[in-house]
UniProtKB/Swiss-Prot annotation:
One record GO biological process: DNA-templated transcription
Binding residues annotated for Mn(2+) 2, in chain numbering: E80, D108
Protein name, as recorded: Polymerase acidic protein
Annotated binding of Mn(2+) 1, by residue: H41, D108, E119, I120
Gene that this sequence comes from: PA
Major place of residence: host cell
Source organism of the structure: Influenza A virus (strain A/Tokyo/3/1967 H2N2)
Amino acid sequence: MEDFVRQCFNPMIVELAEKAMKEYGEDLKIETNKFAAICTHLEVCFMYSDFHFINEQGESIVVELDDPNALLKHRFEIIEGRDRTMAWTVVNSICNTTGAEKPKFLPDLYDYKENRFIEIGVTRREVHIYYLEKANKIKSENTHIHIFSFTGEEMATKADYTLDEESRARIKTRLFTIRQEMANRGLWDSFRQSERGEETIEERFEITGTMRRLADQSLPPNFSCLENFRAYVDGFEPNGYIEGKLSQMSKEVNAKIEPFLKTTPRPIRLPDGPPCFQRSKFLLMDALKLSIEDPSHEGEGIPLYDAIKCMRTFFGWKEPYIVKPHEKGINPNYLLSWKQVLAELQDIENEEKIPRTKNMKKTSQLKWALGENMAPEKVDFDNCRDISDLKQYDSDEPELRSLSSWIQNEFNKACELTDSTWIELDEIGEDVAPIEYIASMRRNYFTAEVSHCRATEYIMKGVYINTALLNASCAAMDDFQLIPMISKCRTKEGRRKTNLYGFIIKGRSHLRNDTDVVNFVSMEFSLTDPRLEPHKWEKYCVLEIGDMLLRSAIGQMSRPMFLYVRTNGTSKIKMKWGMEMRRCLLQSLQQIESMIEAESSVKEKDMTKEFFENKSETWPIGESPKGVEDGSIGKVCRTLLAKSVFNSLYASPQLEGFSAESRKLLLVVQALRDNLEPGTFDLGGLYEAIEECLINDPWVLLNASWFNSFLTHALR
């Protein structure tokens, strides 16, 4: 192929193609088909421009080279074939002098008569397929597209072919000649198929023996041997109807392709039922902290020491009592468990030296709360093979739950700023190479936007709790260890602060497999009255344990302090992921970075500084019933972070399923918005798969509600 290209094309074109391939790091000795394609495209661009001039009256005329009028103004400016820097300089110059809109991608030509950029395409496939690909990539009404094929077909924007018929015929004849020359040398099939990315390597050797038998056995239905299947594939027309392709694959498939129009999609049906309940492993917006600033006490940094110091800052303790019972639990046991924690903490304080860890007495209330001796006895399967009615436990279907407003409030709160810094710069990692200067700048800007965010507090809280629980589960397997729920931050003045949210008591934890469960009881402080949204706290028993004096603009006021108690469980694998919640920072930073990259590629310079410092510009954050919500770049950073954090906090099979299935519908809707005229079959089945995941999970239900808002506004 390389020899053919050098013989068939003008040396200047060959040299330009070599430069282009070198610029993109491609080896023309290996990518010979690409080499031929670039030469062909260059030649078509030059032929398109040749002999076309504009006279003094501004009319387009065709003039042969030996004509004395060849000093007339060229009608077309050739952009293709120049190196990228020079090409963009030419484009910018044209835009400045003509007022044309700057294209996002480098076009091939500029037409001074029609005042428009032109994108030339040369395809070995169907012209309309290639045209759609070009149009979808460019997404600009200002760039004119003209596609030629090797079979003499052509397609142009609005059927406006720009050139006279004779000029176009010259191009088509040249393409047909190239095709014939390639075919004569046995190069055409490889060249034709390479545009579709087809592998042709199997044509070079014969499959025999065992591999041949395996090939014959693994054919799709209705094909008796490999030759038949090969013949079918070779003659396969890519522009055939999808229905036809499907029916050829299997007699069982009978799919009717339906056009997907603006009126086609319906909203996702959310389940009815009682409101959904809070299921996170720790309280989020309702959490209350007992804090100490600039901790310098003996044993500072040892969780139990820190916890006792924080507990001493509160003086409003009172005799606890139940204000919202757990419907199914033995509520007095929860009350007794809290009293036991207070008593055992008091015992520690009375000791001469405070221990580093505290194992609780195995009282009846804790045994009940932690499910001690409740698990059924495990019997080896071999010992019960002969039991005729051996069967798995009957399990009830989960009860359907409806979306409740509290989860949207939780998300909104997670996006807000607090008055403390929750991460230091080194949480994301230091530079390791000079090239990371821009990365450092982006990281610093991003950190500044999210370090005060409540979602970042949830990350650090989650990392601490999961690390402490996993350590205790491994180090004290048989003990009911008391684990303080602690976080650390800095005040806006830069002072260190240690916070206590409550306590966890861990149950027995002989965790052999990743999915083996350790039970724990969580006891968390809060100022939220559970009677305001009792459905949210279905899984909790809530006690009133004290009164807190709060300073406000009108003076001091007393508020009841509550303790939210519940039995919960987790596993090694869940704790492992919980310990790695800092990944959420990285994920949201990468999403922001892709936005900066998109902006930078359009402007052709790094836009990091402008992106973060232009406070007047707003960005789309998400959909709501009101429409598309906009906000500052900081709000975008915090929203993306909160989404990532909630995906971690509320991780579940329902979320996995909903994300995977709803994405398919999203892609079809996106194709419709891009005017790609998508078609679908079994759309009902897709809706079924999506709605199957909407059971009772609050975060999934909220995402489904957001998806419906998106559908409403995307298809207006």
